[in-house]
């Protein structure tokens, strides 16, 4: 919700939500514009798109596409807002994903990213690393699955740090 507030959504604007999952960001955006905006939800996972279509079937102005972030099937300068939530670290080519984001955004468009990354403060990193060992155990206990939480921790550890991401974003004209 804070992400949506940061965007200050306006009616008649176009949002692309990449790695959209089941469309929660698009729904929140529409709910804040009285459903007077165009939403494009993109995810490489056909199952997530199917669940999103079903869940948000009463939202007529959401278009759904199966596509990776690195190869978006849209013209240059199409969208006013580009969002990606917890999906950037899962792209196969981070540089290409950022390049595509810049390409499809209109001049002056806004790129908003929610993502986990490595902690750069050594004191906090020590706490995080110990806590992160518990997350898969908690996942096993609460939902009966450990593997997705193992993957989450591993993907965060393998992702670049915040400074490296900022450098890469600057190289892609953000």
What are the language-model segments listed below?
Residues 95-110:
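A short glycine-rich, Lys/Arg-flanked "PGG" loop and its adjoining helix->strand segment in the class I
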Residues 70-82:
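A short acidic, Gly/Pro-enriched loop at the edge of an enzyme's catalytic core
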Residues 42, 114, 118-168, 172:
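C-terminal alpha-helical "lid/dimerization" subdomain adjacent to the S-adenosyl-L-methionine
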Residues 1-13, 28:
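Conserved alpha-helix/loop element of class I SAM-dependent methyltransferases that forms part
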Residues 14-71:
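Class I SAM-dependent methyltransferase SAM/SAH-binding core
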Residues 4, 27-30, 98-102:
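A structural alpha-helix within SAM-dependent methyltransferase catalytic domains
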Residues 80-94:
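A short SAM/SAH-binding and catalytic strip from SAM-dependent methyltransferases
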């Amino acid at each position: 919700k804070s992400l949506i507030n940061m965007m200050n959504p306006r009616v008649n604007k176009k949002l692309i939500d990449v790695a959209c999952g089941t469309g929660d960001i698009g729904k929140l955006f529409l709910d804040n514009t009285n459903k007077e905006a165009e939403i494009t939800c993109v995810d490489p996972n056909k199952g997530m798109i199917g669940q999103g279509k079903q869940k948000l079937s009463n939202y007529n102005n959401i278009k759904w596409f199966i596509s990776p972030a690195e190869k978006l099937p849209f013209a240059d300068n199409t969208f006013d807002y580009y969002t990606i939530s917890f999906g950037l670290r899962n792209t196969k080519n981070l540089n290409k994903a950022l390049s595509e984001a810049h390409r499809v955004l209109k001049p002056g468009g806004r790129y908003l990213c929610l993502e986990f990354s490595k902690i750069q403060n050594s004191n906090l990193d020590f706490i995080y690393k110990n806590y992160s060992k518990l997350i898969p155990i908690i996942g096993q206990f609460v939902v009966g699955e450990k593997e997705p939480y193992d993957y989450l921790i591993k993907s965060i550890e393998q992702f670049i740090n915040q400074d490296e991401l900022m450098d890469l974003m600057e190289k892609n004209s953000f």
